[in-house]
């Protein structure tokens, strides 16, 4: 459970931001810097600039100017009525330095942090102040009721495929914190998804996962993740966030984003490179072994990065002797990533000796020596371009007798090693280690002493800036070099939960173009799958059922023997069942009227349970999410109504009935025939009525059409249309369906036929009641 009362939580989880964010770091193209406080008064030495509140402890000055000629000028804040040095607090400059401002600033963007323990509520003014002459060079007043930006808590995710989370936090304008996220990982093409409006559509945009990847999502079980919106996209551009199956256009669960959220700008929007907020030191250059860290309150977040061989570990720890790097007695963390599963590990070790752990002696996990002594919390792990990256948290203080404290007031001697894991997934003797004294000041101002990740750039101020810090040069960086985890701006002491004062603010003015795609783009086609081992599903012949009534319901795809093997397309978990059969091929005759009783769901607010039935010449389905040029190429024969304005509305809509597998039974892959699998299914229906559509194929109907879902792709299969029903044309191979009695009301309501359009055939629809028993839809009489 995320401890929201912990003040440093924002920085802590900021380190988990997408690991590849630096690759796309660049100039921000939108003018949002937080809440504007005002302009600096122009008093002396050319001081000017616009001052913004980034969050409770951070000030941003846009286009700051100062001639640099005064002998002792500093940034100051105070709580007196007007600027003075009485009781005022001096700020570090934008580089973390404490020296006076002796260099010239010309239209430079400057970000400053308030002293520890102070917030904007505690001060009344900000000033450029000269100590030597006690002169105010320029200042701005801080309003007592200043509504500074802060993270905002919104709703939690709830959806299908096990999608869930705790309440999501909008950390800043480009960062989302999703606590305790879960997803079963069973869909083939699920992505994190954002877009305009309140509901997701295929017009939206995928966003990278917590490791910066856009691959289909794997299984998550209550994992807290941080996601970064790509490029210049911000929360002001989007109306929802969720999980979306891109190939099948299915919403697995989403939340709406309230308008006008008062959140901080991201680091990129302020032109700040992520590594400027992190510490980094190279431990072993040959394997690109680095340690990155940030102190967060009473704890420290550490990220280890190395190019490891399979089944190897990297370790980092504190020496028991402050004067030498001593392995024996050290408190270390051993970390690695399993390249097969992607799972990461970070284990608390006590190095009692050089031997492998045996009987609590040697290099042992703390828990092998004493129970409940693992003081390490794994936050994230990933494999990126062959680099193992593990992020963990531990307390600065020692929490048990096997731990050593980490000082933030001086240098600590550290130890590190790389080596193979043994059969017990514990350390074997190291292959590489530090042979000389290596000391680190963990409490220093952030300093990046590592090669810059590919694509990283410095502060993106105007070309007129002078005296900017030189960019770090990389000897080992380059293509594929691992990115840094990105912390957020200084931690806030609180966040909003969508209180009234946090909403209804005007979002920042944006340029006309945004990163959201405004035109429908092609939906990716799932890769073909192996059709070997497909179940034999009996076709529904043209002479059956005698009354021409088909019952269309939802059910499982049947694992590797079902939908994928039958059609050659990947399924996303559900398919149409016609008269109890999994996507059977249907044979019909021109000139005969057929009735489809549809029970695929009728609540469009839950897209994963809303499957309007329709018939067209399109083998894919999902008409609703096609681009306009794609729609023009599709002819629909049944299941829609077209209004005079041209709006196409599905009419094959009814309550949801679902063939449900036995959760205690074997998986579908274990069944050798559909008949055996079908006997384990139970039909479960929601309250309400089915929908009914009628269809009469004619001489203009192609020989092959398809039944599908109007809102999702790849849920149905083929309908073969014949001129007559004889043994050759109709494919008579034995009965596949039973007759089912239906009872229409005495005065059934018949909809007006849809206006005929060149791409749409008219059809009539009726609503009716059914007289179904629990075993209405039994499998055909054909023996299995």
Swiss-Prot record:
GO BP annotations, alphabetical order: cell division; meiotic cell cycle; nucleus organization; spindle assembly
Region of interest: Disordered: 451-491
Q: Quick one: which gene encodes this?
A: Skel
Residue span, DM13 domain: 34-143, 151-258
Quaternary structure (record): Interacts with Chro and Mgtor as part of a macromolecular complex forming the spindle matrix. Chro colocalizes with Skeletor (Skel) on the chromosomes at interphase and on spindle during metaphase.
Cellular localisation? Cytoplasm, Cytoskeleton, Spindle; Nucleus, Nucleolus; Chromosome
GO cellular component terms listed in the entry, alphabetical order: cytoplasm; microtubule; nucleolus; nucleus; polytene chromosome; spindle
Q: What does this protein do?
A: Provides structural support to stabilize and organize the microtubule spindle during mitosis (within embryonic somatic cells) and meiosis (within spermatocytes). The role in mitosis regulation depends on the Ran pathway.
Boundaries of each DOMON domain copy? Answer: 287-419
List keywords of the entry alphabetically: Cell cycle, Cell division, Chromosome, Cytoplasm, Cytoskeleton, Meiosis, Microtubule, Mitosis, Nucleus, Repeat, Signal
- Source taxonomy: Eukaryota, Metazoa, Ecdysozoa, Arthropoda, Hexapoda
User: Which residues does UniProt assign to the signal peptide?
Assistant: 1-28
In Swiss-Prot or TrEMBL terms, this protein is called: Protein Skeletor, isoforms B/C
**One Pfam family name from the record?**
At5g54830
Superkingdom of origin organism: Eukaryota
Where does this chain mainly localize? cytoplasm
């Amino acid at each position: 459970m995320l401890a929201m009362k912990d003040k440093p939580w924002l920085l802590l989880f900021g380190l988990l931001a997408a690991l590849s964010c630096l690759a796309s770091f660049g100039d921000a193209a939108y003018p949002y810097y937080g809440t504007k406080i005002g302009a600096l008064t122009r008093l002396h030495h050319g001081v000017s600039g616009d001052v913004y509140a980034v969050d409770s402890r951070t000030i941003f000055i846009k286009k700051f100017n100062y001639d640099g000629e005064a002998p002792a000028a500093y940034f100051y804040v105070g709580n007196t009525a007007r600027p003075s040095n009485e009781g005022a607090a001096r700020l570090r400059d934008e580089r973390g330095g404490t020296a006076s401002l002796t260099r010239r600033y010309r239209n430079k963007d400057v970000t400053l942090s308030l002293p520890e323990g102070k917030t904007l509520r505690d001060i009344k003014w900000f000033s450029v102040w000269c100590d030597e002459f006690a002169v105010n060079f320029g200042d701005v007043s801080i309003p007592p009721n200043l509504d500074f930006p802060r993270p905002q808590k919104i709703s939690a995710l709830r959806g299908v495929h096990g999608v869930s989370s705790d309440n999501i936090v909008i950390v800043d304008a480009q960062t989302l914190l999703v606590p305790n996220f879960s997803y079963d990982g069973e869909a083939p093409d699920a992505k994190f998804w954002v877009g305009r409006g309140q509901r997701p559509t295929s017009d939206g945009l995928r966003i990278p996962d917590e490791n910066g990847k856009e691959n289909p999502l794997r299984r998550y079980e209550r994992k807290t993740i941080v996601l970064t919106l790509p490029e210049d996209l911000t929360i002001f551009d989007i109306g929802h966030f969720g999980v979306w199956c891109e190939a099948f256009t299915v919403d697995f669960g989403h939340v709406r984003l309230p308008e006008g959220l008062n959140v901080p700008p991201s680091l990129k929007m302020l032109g700040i490179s992520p590594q400027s907020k992190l510490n980094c030191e190279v431990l072993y250059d040959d394997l690109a072994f680095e340690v990155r860290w940030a102190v967060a309150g009473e704890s420290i977040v550490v990220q280890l990065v190395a190019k490891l061989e399979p089944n190897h570990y990297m370790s980092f720890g504190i020496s028991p002797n402050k004067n030498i790097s001593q392995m024996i007695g050290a408190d270390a963390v051993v970390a690695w990533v399993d390249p097969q599963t992607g799972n990461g590990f970070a284990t608390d070790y006590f190095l009692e000796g050089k031997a492998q752990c045996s009987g609590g002696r040697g290099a042992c996990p703390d828990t092998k020596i004493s129970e409940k002594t693992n003081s390490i919390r794994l936050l994230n792990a990933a494999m990126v371009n062959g680099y193992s990256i593990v992020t963990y948290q531990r307390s600065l203080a020692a929490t048990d007798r096997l731990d050593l404290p980490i000082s933030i007031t001086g240098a600590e001697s550290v130890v590190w090693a790389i080596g193979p894991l043994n059969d017990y997934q514990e350390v074997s003797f190291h292959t590489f280690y530090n042979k000389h004294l290596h000391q680190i000041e963990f409490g220093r101002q952030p300093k990046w002493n590592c090669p810059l990740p590919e694509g990283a750039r410095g502060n993106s101020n105007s070309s007129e800036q002078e005296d900017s810090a030189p960019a770090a040069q990389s000897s080992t960086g380059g293509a594929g070099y691992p990115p840094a985890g990105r912390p957020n701006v200084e931690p806030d002491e609180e966040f909003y939960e969508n209180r009234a004062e946090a909403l209804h603010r005007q979002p920042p003015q944006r340029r006309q173009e945004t990163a959201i795609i405004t035109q429908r783009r092609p939906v990716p086609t799932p890769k073909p799958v192996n059709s070997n081992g497909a179940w034999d599903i009996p076709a529904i012949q043209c002479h059956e059922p005698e009354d021409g009534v088909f019952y269309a319901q939802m059910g499982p795809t049947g694992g590797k023997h079902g939908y994928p093997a039958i059609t050659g397309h990947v399924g996303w978990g559900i398919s149409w069942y016609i008269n109890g059969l999994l996507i059977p091929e249907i044979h019909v005759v021109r000139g005969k009227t057929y009735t489809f009783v549809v029970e695929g769901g009728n609540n469009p607010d839950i897209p994963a349970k809303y499957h309007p039935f329709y018939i067209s010449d399109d083998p894919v389905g999902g008409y609703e999410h096609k681009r306009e040029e794609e729609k023009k190429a599709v002819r629909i024969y049944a299941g829609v109504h077209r209004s005079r304005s041209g709006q196409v509305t599905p009419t094959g809509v009814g309550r949801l009935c679902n063939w449900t597998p036995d959760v205690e039974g074997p998986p579908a892959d274990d069944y050798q025939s559909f008949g055996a699998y079908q006997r384990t299914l139970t039909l479960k229906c929601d309250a309400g009525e089915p929908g009914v559509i009628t269809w009469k194929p004619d001489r203009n109907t192609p020989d092959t059409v398809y039944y599908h879902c109007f809102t999702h792709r790849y849920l149905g299969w083929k309908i073969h249309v014949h001129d007559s029903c004889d043994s050759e044309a109709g494919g008579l191979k034995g009965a596949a369906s039973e007759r089912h009695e239906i009872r229409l009301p005495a005065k059934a309501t018949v909809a007006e036929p849809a206006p005929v359009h060149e791409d749409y055939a008219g059809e009539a629809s009726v609503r009716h009641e059914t007289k179904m028993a629990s075993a209405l839809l039994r499998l055909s009489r054909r023996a299995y």
